[in-house]
């Protein structure tokens, strides 16, 4: 019967712990750069901070409740049709809610048939038979009413909810796009505000549609249940009400603890989530420093913090559910026991007692379910307050009705302007600023960081208004001008152009109507037409967040085309070419030069070399105009501009290279001859000196300059190979020179972790150094521990490529099918004892469902078939049995939920560790795939592991419980009457469909179209992220048009969606009642045909009615399990994936010595995500040990790819990358990367202390070594100036550092690593000139450290200490040689470096 869940199916909300029990050993000796040091009080700096925080603690004040609108205000956007829908929906919900109570009323009449007189010749009289048929037909009528009311209820509330929230969304977006820029400065324009709006609207929609209907439905059940209960037997109803608070208290107390524990466990897992997110986000850095084991340990250790919470949740859940069910069953036994007094004294019959009892129980459950909606109502009211407050907010105070100038000359004047941002009013940006821009002239604004130059463009665009002063256009204050007209006269091009998720055509024409011919003409002027035409869909190619990814150069060209199409009088350029390489910068500058002709132009520049041709240069300092004039005039003045230019030029002009200081040439010749005797030539680099000191002197040997073109190569020989053992050690027993001083293996000191088996050879240590050396001993080899020039290695064996190929064939081939049940069971096998104990509890509790129904049915039949003392004895016996079952239920629930909970927690933890460990074994190419983005992987770690738990431990618990319920119910049915049992079983498929449909409905009305809302929100998110572009090009109406179009599609879809969901839900409820009517009809038929007695038949009918949900639920779980099986498949695809580049091959080589010779031989390469684009083609490059080679080239020529191949982030498609004559594939991957130091263009800083960021390279480094590394990196001074020094927390939760400071910390990390091979990837390209100089000095010192160095550069500053320069174009070497040689060729190298040297490039010689 449908009331069975009313007695046994309700429980406090089930809260699944996010993080499980961990089984990790002792922590490492050194702190992890992933873990928050605030969590451990071992550091003095951290402890001091903690003490300060304790002193600052004040008594907590209770926060006032958040503001909320009145409930009626939720429907403020409803029109007349919405009110009609809500009225019909409410009536239908009330009718649907009373249906179960009405059925219960007729159930009493079914039981009352037992009181009819029977025919002596028949087991059932004609009156009884006809009455049962009549009642079964009545239940069919109820089923029809439920079908109609359920359909109308769901459909009406879905439709009205979508309609009302569509109006709210539209009004909100309209107001949002009309806000001034100070609003976005305050609340952010990074898309978070859109996500908040989307979630707020969903809360409102849930509150005013789904939850209102659900509330009316359950309140109707509550009211009708009380009425029916008191009408049938008010005494029983009253007593049942009196016991209700005790049952509610048991569940409520456990809920309070569960919610608190849930919050604690969320906070505990946040630390682990942060570790995982940083690890997968910065995986290249993590791999480069071979810290995979540390990351795994840190992640596992952070999961340890959730151990006690997981156990407590399982404990509280088991006890809470046990006492709730136990008290409910004992209460039922008491009501039935009291009922016998009313039956004996003829004050009520059995049907009235059972109806009163269950009607009040259902009434209480209805009230409980109705009360759960109040939380949603409160959330909806709070969300509505936030949205309605925004909707009622006045739009931008700017003038929309101003004047329009008849003709625009373009004279611009800033007159005594004072300005500060509203979000930071205490910080003055401009203070008495004056500036005049003559018509059709270009004025460049320069100055130090924080001088205020970047605020000029938003003031000119009227994103903001000055605090004091005025901005004039042709003598008219721009406040008096019509805003839309003003912005139509201004073209804006920025360094980071905004592209929206539209086609290229729509992006160029953004905010205005234009023909395709006009768009193409604008693209041609912007030098964009060629690359657009080469795309498959041309101008219809989708770009932006959801479309094709374009290069920065291409984005800027589209931005220029957009400005060209606007044909503005005034042009604003904000550091347009700052992030481009030389060739891209030249092309873009040509397009800008054309665009600037005949227009008043303001240029914001940070690189002074780009603005020498401006008509005037204005120099700003602290918000004021310091000086203004032409380039030559300002140079002659010799003030700030000259100083800034001098700083920039200092980073460009090549310096003399450091060379060895020999007392006489004979000494050098002797060493050269000695070297030749060992089978190799002296490398061209003068830094290959074996002297521990690199001193400058007067007697300098300068090697002959070499120059090669694309068809030539240096005449260098590879070092002679030597014979090696299988482990990479030399078979030569002669004298061996020790290796460079290296770090001790931190991994060797970590406790053993399950599924983490990483072995690392113990490396030798050395502490010798020359105190006389001007170069730190951290940068050079130990004099007693030099790299051996003679101990080199032969090429790899031929079969290594075959092995790699076989791995690639197997790539991602596992688990196309979901994992088997046995695979899941294997994961939980260590907790088999917990599973056994939990299964015992689940089996006992599941069996009690039909057993309790059977005993209650016996009590009810006893009311009719027994009298006097026999009735009293029988009822007492059965009620005592029910009470005992209630007590056993407490124990059974505790066993079930506590032990299955522990098993699930351990399984979740184990799967998370296995997934994280497997992720960190994959090659970098795996992370490049879209489905393996950091956000996605972090989310999968958080959620997918819980799916494994849900699919096994949770579902196993319910499956065992319901399976025993089914088995016991079938056994009871077969014992009482097998024919009726078979009919009941035949209805199971139909009831299964009903259960599935109902579960889908209970999951929420709105989920079916949430994806459409997400797509609609992308339009708004694009606009908010690029709000400056939207406002500057007056495209708010365009955004509004696109958004409304999406809303119209959603409304059309929601109508059909609502009707379909409503029909499915109504029909599912119809099937539930119709099957019950069928069962009652066959019960009457069975008795009439003398298959069984009437009392026995009705007992079996009641058993199956009570057990209906238990019989159906295992099948109802099918869609959930099938859905989760897809998630499970993805989990095991990660765990079982075989990486194409194996990091843990213990049979690979780990030689004791490294020479440092690197060769890329006949390389063909394309990225796995772009196999159609060949990045390197038949590429060859050789770098001798100790040499420094610079690689330059246009954007996309393959420069950074070289470093990725050397770090073995990727393997080439064809060819070989060799280290000391052996293919990189023959080396152990972690060993290989441990001998390389990598400095990237974007410095990666972990969210921890500066100390831990530096010692990330070598965890056993001493304090002195760490500080020495910081000094070499020019970082010690600024670190020491911070309040907490090296213990300062940086990153997401700490102090914000500049890009230059971050880069210096990254350099210090590489210095501390002291690897023999150094890889630098445009380390100073993204840093402003002033900071770039400091970073450049640190790089210079690092490069002088006697290492094999490959640097990617696009500034001449990086060419100071190079032995060879390689120029790339199209994945091939087109020029090669020294700086002077390449400068003399006047080829691509000259064109690339022209912006940095000017016309006199050839004069600069490397001396």
Swiss-Prot record:
Keyword field: ATP-binding, Glycoprotein, Membrane, Nucleotide-binding, Repeat, Transmembrane, Transmembrane helix, Transport
Cellular compartments per GO CC: Golgi apparatus; plasma membrane; plasmodesma
Binding site for ATP 1: 447-454
Binding site residues for ATP 2: 1193-1200
Positions of the UniProt region annotated as Disordered: 18-65, 670-696, 709-815
Residues bearing attached sugar chains per UniProt: 291, 449, 663, 727, 767, 1178, 1260, 1346
Biased composition (Acidic residues): 50-63
GO molecular function annotations of the record: ABC-type transporter activity; ATP binding; ATP hydrolysis activity
Role: Probable auxin efflux transporter that contributes, together with ABCB20 and in a FKBP42/TWD1-dependent manner, to the regulation of leaf position and morphology, internode distribution, roots development, and inflorescence organization, probably by modulating auxin repartition.
Name of protein: ABC transporter B family member 6
